From Swiss-Prot:
Coiled-coil parts of chain: none
Protein location: Plastid, Chloroplast thylakoid membrane
Annotated membrane topology: Multi-pass membrane protein
Keywords: Chloroplast, Membrane, Photosynthesis, Photosystem II, Plastid, Reaction center, Thylakoid, Transmembrane, Transmembrane helix
Superkingdom: Eukaryota
Organism in which the protein naturally occurs: Zygnema circumcarinatum
Name recorded for this polypeptide: Photosystem II reaction center protein Z
GO biological process: photosynthesis; photosystem II stabilization
Length: 62
């Protein structure tokens, strides 16, 4: 169970890093928002899901 928790935290960190870098780049590029809107929303949905997953797994680990 601990390795699953660690992998979920690692995935959350990587996703957070990619969103912190990617979203401003998408918003700054010309015509970036309209063409990459689905990608940004998918990344945000993945991030929210990982936050809940880490929270649930944390109750089993600690």
């Amino acid at each position: 169970m601990t390795i699953t928790f660690q992998l979920a935290v690692f995935a959350l960190i990587v996703t957070s890093f990619l969103l912190v870098i990617g979203v401003p780049v998408v918003l700054a590029s010309p015509d970036g928002w309209s063409s990459n809107k689905n990608t940004v929303f998918s990344g945000a949905s993945l991030w929210i899901g990982l936050v809940f997953l880490v929270g649930i797994l944390n109750s089993f680990v600690s």
